[in-house]
Amino acid sequence: KYVGVEIAKGFVEDLQKRVKVLKETYGEASVDFVLNDIRNYEFKDCSLVTSIFTLQFMSKKDRARVIQDIYNGLNSGGGFIFAEKIDCENARLQDMMTFNYYDFKRGKFEYDDIMTKERTLRHMLKPNTWREIEDMVLNAGFKTVEQSWRNHNFIGAVAIK
């Protein structure tokens, strides 16, 4: 069974429409989307949990607790796949990565659009360094965690219980 947890009502309604199409196309797909905040969601009997650019919007305390909740809800050998924006540990490298990413985005978006999004997200994002994220995941009890993807200040990783 696949369960998606979404905090925004409009997104859940859209996702539920997509599930209807999936079921019409592939038969009785066991997919559901629930309106909830993952800080309040009870993870249980999970083989795999994914979190794509979600934890970075939480306080460090909430993030650590959610990672612990995910670990507790995973079956032995279960996986946690996640992607997050990260900060570099070195301020100079952080600036280099940030401006290099802006250059990359300018190939697809207007400068004003890039800066508007940056200003909008700046007060909401709470990125950690990779080392801080790795420590949180290992402190929750995961046996291993490895980066599987990186692009500028964004990483994807896999952790195994």
Predicted regions and their residues:
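Class I SAM-dependent methyltransferase SAM/SAH-binding core
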Residues: K1-N40
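Conserved acidic residues
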Residues: C46-S47
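A conserved beta-strand element that flanks and buttresses the S-adenosyl-L-methionine
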Residues: T50
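Short catalytic micro-motifs in class I SAM-dependent methyltransferases
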Residues: F53-F57, E84
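A short glycine-rich, Lys/Arg-flanked "PGG" loop and its adjoining helix->strand segment in the class I
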Residues: A64-S76
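Conserved beta-strand signature within the Rossmann-like core of class I S-adenosyl-L-methionine
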Residues: G77-K85
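C-terminal alpha-helical "lid/dimerization" subdomain adjacent to the S-adenosyl-L-methionine
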Residues: K85-A140
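Core SAM-dependent methyltransferase catalytic element
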Residues: E134-K161
